[in-house]
C-alpha cells in the first residue's frame, strides 16, 4: 500500500490527491476490481487470449494504415 507522508503546512486535499495518484500508479484499484469476483481459470485464460487477439488486430490495422499513408 502506498505511504504518503504529509508535509509541513500541506493541506489535506493536496495530501489526499497525492495518495490517490500514488494508488493509481501502483495499480491497486484495478487489482481490486479484477479480484472483486471469482473468475474461473478457464474464463481468465479465455479473456486474456481475447484481449491478446484484440491487441494484435489493432497493431496490424495501425501498420496497414501507416503503409497506406506512405504510398
Swiss-Prot record:
Checking InterPro entries in the record gives: Ribosomal_bS21, Ribosomal_bS21_CS, Ribosomal_bS21_sf
Q: Is Ribosomal protein tagged as a keyword?
A: yes
Key word Plastid present: no
> Per the UniProt entry, what are the Gene Ontology biological process annotations, in alphabetical order?
translation
Q: List, alphabetically, the GO terms of the cellular component aspect.
A: ribonucleoprotein complex; ribosome
- Enumerate the UniProt keywords alphabetically: Ribonucleoprotein, Ribosomal protein
Its transmembrane ranges are none
Known PROSITE patterns for this protein? RIBOSOMAL_S21 (PS01181)
Q: Name one GO molecular function term.
A: structural constituent of ribosome
- PANTHER family xref list: MITOCHONDRIAL 28S RIBOSOMAL PROTEIN S21, SMALL RIBOSOMAL SUBUNIT PROTEIN BS21
Its family remark reads:
Belongs to the bacterial ribosomal protein bS21 family.
What is this protein's name?
Small ribosomal subunit protein bS21
The record lists the organism as Blochmanniella pennsylvanica (strain BPEN)
Amino acid at each position: 500500500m502506498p505511504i504518503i507522508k504529509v508535509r509541513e503546512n500541506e493541506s489535506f486535499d493536496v495530501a489526499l490527491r497525492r495518495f490517490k495518484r500514488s494508488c493509481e500508479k501502483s495499480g491497486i484499484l484495478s487489482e481490486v476490481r479484477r479480484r472483486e469476483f471469482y473468475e474461473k481459470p478457464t474464463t481468465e485464460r479465455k479473456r486474456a487470449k481475447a484481449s491478446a487477439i484484440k491487441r494484435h488486430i489493432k497493431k496490424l490495422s495501425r501498420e496497414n494504415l501507416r503503409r497506406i499513408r506512405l504510398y
